[in-house]
C-alpha cells in the first residue's frame, strides 16, 4: 500500500504558504494566532536561497 505522505515542496507551499494564508480571513486568523503564541515560523517556508 502506498504511503499517504508524498512530500513535494510545491504543493506544500501552495496549500500552507504565507501568501495562501493571507488570502482568506480565516488564514489571517491562523497567522494572528501563531504570532500571539510567538511561533518562530508563522507559515510553511522552504529553506533555501
UniProtKB/Swiss-Prot annotation:
The keyword Ribosomal protein is assigned to this record: yes
InterPro entries, sorted: Ribosomal_bL34, Ribosomal_bL34_CS
PANTHER family: LARGE RIBOSOMAL SUBUNIT PROTEIN BL34M, MITOCHONDRIAL RIBOSOMAL PROTEIN 34 FAMILY MEMBER
Keyword Ribonucleoprotein listed: yes
Coiled-coil parts of chain: none
Domain of life: Bacteria
HAMAP family: Ribosomal_bL34 (MF_00391)
Pfam families in alphabetical order: Ribosomal_L34
Family as reported in the entry's similarity comment: Belongs to the bacterial ribosomal protein bL34 family.
GO MF annotation terms: structural constituent of ribosome
Organism: Geobacter metallireducens (strain ATCC 53774 / DSM 7210 / GS-15)
GO BP annotations, alphabetical order: translation
Cellular component terms per the entry's GO annotation: ribonucleoprotein complex; ribosome
Protein name: Large ribosomal subunit protein bL34
Cleaved signal peptide residues: none
UniProt keyword terms in alphabetical order: Ribonucleoprotein, Ribosomal protein
